[in-house]
From Swiss-Prot:
Protein name (record): Alpha-2-HS-glycoprotein
Modification Phosphoserine occurs at: S134, S138, S307, S311, S314, S316
GO cellular component, one term: extracellular matrix
Glycosylation-annotated residues: N99, N156, N176
Secretion signal, residue range per the UniProt entry: 1-18
Organism: Meriones unguiculatus
Domain Cystatin fetuin-A-type stretches: 19-133, 144-255
Keywords from the UniProt entry: Disulfide bond, Glycoprotein, Phosphoprotein, Repeat, Secreted, Signal
Length: 348
């Protein structure tokens, strides 16, 4: 009898520790494709994208698990496990998420996994706890879909550093007004044949005039940040090397009301004189960082790329209205099994 009593006590104690703080012990199960659950999940993804510090926006792919806990004295807490996919829109891109393309398998897709605790009270959602990480698809799986497609390459690869410097140099040479400085290397891929390196990066306007800058380290970013997102490719041909780069300006980061507009770009196919060997350093923000100090990673992991709510104990959270749900809301009634929910795009 004593053993049964002790077992019951331990069971209750474990339940108290595993439940989100401020909730009752009981929770109700809801279908992952329930319209209200999807509304909460879209709110969570919206929060994620609003707090991204670098990398690319993510979009909801699947709701894996959901529990709804009653919260004392009012409201309820949604405990969600979500799968997301990386889009082609950078974190600074003002394009609405609904208009962002999902990065496909052949483009070396990246999947995110997130846990959220979201309080619903008086018709508002407050994010109480977040925890995310992300991983690229394996090279083997990409090769199954597209044997000759470009694969993600570490940021500190000498070929990548070389390509970024060449592209930035070409951009500043073409732009005869403001000197731009690299602030983030967002993505890099290589193709063995024909030998080429493809990079995506963010630059910002400085107080220096282009194209001739003796010491880039002395150039400071403007008070009202003017960012541009660039895509560039460096091709190794029999006749030499060729770099192409195109950049798009984002609205000014202040009271910015200016719409996104094309920034000066190097026309495709213009050869650019390159140094004899890859440079030893790469300009990042206001500093010159040696290439060997760049991180040995192939993408910006959500674990480090966004600023989350620290823990479930910050119960005040950040209150905001949920985004408008677009498209089919899924099944209105409970499904069997309740979870996981439908896959909106594809699984990695």
């Amino acid at each position: 009898m004593k053993t049964l009593v002790l077992l019951l006590c331990f069971t209750l104690l474990w339940g108290c520790q595993s439940a989100p703080q401020g909730t009752g012990l009981g929770f109700r199960e809801v279908a992952c494709d329930d319209p209200e659950v999807e509304q909460v999940a879209l709110t969570a993804v919206d929060y994620l994208n609003q707090h991204l510090l670098q990398g690319f926006k993510h979009i909801l792919n699947q709701i894996d698990k959901v529990k709804v806990w009653s919260r004392r004295p009012f409201g309820e807490v949604y405990e969600l496990e979500l799968d997301t996919l990386e889009t082609t829109c950078h974190a600074l891109d003002p394009t609405p998420l609904a208009n962002c393309s999902v990065r496909q398998l052949a483009q070396h897709a990246v999947e995110g996994d997130c846990d959220f605790h979201i309080l619903k009270q008086d018709g508002q959602f407050s994010v109480m706890h977040t925890k995310c990480h992300s991983n690229p698809d394996s090279a083997e799986d990409v090769r199954k879909v597209c044997p000759h497609c470009a694969l993600l390459t570490p940021f500190n690869s000498s070929n990548v550093v070389y390509a970024v410097n060449a592209a930035l140099g070409a951009f500043n040479e073409k732009n005869n007004k403001t000197y731009f400085k690299l602030v983030e290397l967002a993505r890099a891929q290589t193709v063995p044949f024909p030998p080429s390196t493809h990079v995506e990066f963010v630059i910002a306007a400085t107080d220096c005039a282009a194209p001739k800058v003796a010491d880039p380290a002395k150039c400071n970013l403007l008070a009202e940040k003017q960012y541009s997102f660039c895509k560039a490719s460096l091709f190794q041909n029999l006749g030499g090397e060729e770099v192409t780069v195109t950049c798009t300006a984002f609205p000014t980061q202040a009271n910015g009301v200016t719409p996104a507009s094309p920034a000066p770009a190097v026309e495709k196919g213009i050869p650019v004189a390159l140094p004899d060997a890859p440079p030893a350093s790469l300009v990042v923000g206001p500093m010159v960082v040696p290439a060997e100090h760049l991180p040995h990673k192939t993408h910006h992991d959500l674990r480090h790329a966004f600023s989350p709510v620290a823990s479930v104990e910050s119960a005040s959270g950040e209150a905001f209205q949920s985004p408008t749900q677009a498209g089919n809301a899924g099944a209105a009634g409970p499904a069997v099994p309740l979870c996981p929910g439908r896959v909106r795009h594809f699984k990695i």
